[in-house]
Swiss-Prot record:
Belongs to the bacterial ribosomal protein bL17 family. This is Large ribosomal subunit protein bL17. One of its GO terms (molecular function) is structural constituent of ribosome. Part of the 50S ribosomal subunit. Contacts protein L32. The keyword Ribonucleoprotein applies. The lineage of its organism: Bacteria, Pseudomonadati, Pseudomonadota, Betaproteobacteria, Nitrosomonadales. GO terms for biological process: translation. Keywords: Ribonucleoprotein, Ribosomal protein. GO terms for cellular component: cytosolic large ribosomal subunit. Pfam families: Ribosomal_L17 (PF01196).
Length: 131
């Protein structure tokens, strides 16, 4: 039985919800870490995990499927050239969702969503001068 296997509506119409998740997916692929509310983060995981699995098998059909879902040529290129090879040996679990306190205005639970096995960013000049 498939009781309670639906998706979170997030108080949006279906077109608004799909556009928001597409934008969040593109942002996460571009920056590799984003901050959002916890329900959005949990719903984003259901979208982006299959996308990265798609990126592990570079074929024209998979590129077209990815472009159909992402609508961003640069992110499709990054998905297949950078992220697919990075997660070639990992069988799922590409995201880490960390609880990040509560938003000041409406006390919504926030979350930090990041890709696993991110390459370490070198410290910028301002960070090294401050420390």
């Amino acid at each position: 039985m498939r009781h309670h296997n639906g998706l979170r509506k997030l108080n949006r119409t279906s077109s608004h919800r799909s556009a928001m998740l597409r934008n969040m997916t593109n942002s996460l692929l571009r920056h590799e870490v984003i901050k959002t509310t916890l329900p959005k983060a949990k719903e984003l995981r259901r979208v982006i995990e299959p996308m990265i699995t798609l990126g592990k098998k570079p074929s024209l059909a998979n590129r077209r499927l990815a472009f159909d879902r992402l609508r961003d040529r640069d992110m499709v290129g990054k998905l297949f050239s950078e992220l697919g090879p990075r997660y070639q040996t990992r069988n799922g679990g590409y995201l880490r969702i960390l609880k990040f306190g509560f938003r000041k205005g409406d006390n919504a639970p926030m979350a930090l969503v990041e890709l696993m096995d991110r390459p370490e960013q070198p410290a910028t000049d301002t960070e090294s001068k401050a420390g």
